[in-house]
Regions:
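Polybasic (Lys/Arg-rich)
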Residues: 32-127
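Core beta-strand-centered patch of the WYL/Sm-like small regulatory domain
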Residues: 1-39, 45-48
Length: 127
């Protein structure tokens, strides 16, 4: 299956061909374990833990990142959540956008991707 951004479609042409949806396929099921749209065929669901500062954490509590979101810790210092999702670019971009208000606790692989992206951001802004 391919996903195309509507903002990238400039012309539509009817090819007079039909497409049969595979038996048992559901669009909701296809996107059930992702934040955003992108995923690869063999991507696995992982358990993600993210620590948020109190201000950002309140926002995340009221507007969950994903339907799998569970609150693990909710105290004066932090709000920590657990997600069960596929790690993809949209998730990484979302976490980077939270800046120092979010910290990936688990898994180490996601934490390393965030660190690598942050290092690239620093490199791109050096004079």
């Amino acid at each position: 299956m391919r996903v195309f951004g509507l903002d990238r479609i400039s012309q539509i042409e009817n090819m007079l061909r039909t497409f049969d949806v595979p038996s048992g396929f559901s669009i909701e099921g296809y996107f059930y374990n992702v934040i955003g749209l992108s995923q690869k065929k063999d991507d696995a669901v992982e358990i993600i833990e993210i620590k948020f500062n109190r201000t950002l954490g309140n926002y995340i509590k009221n507007l969950p990142l994903h339907h799998s979101q569970q609150i693990l810790i909710d105290n004066e210092e932090e709000i920590r959540i657990r997600l069960k999702v596929i790690i993809n670019e949209e998730l990484i971009n979302e976490l980077i956008a939270y800046g120092d208000g979010a910290q990936v606790i688990k898994p180490k692989s996601l934490k390393n991707k965030i660190i690598k992206r942050a290092q690239l951001i620093l490199e791109n802004h050096k004079e």
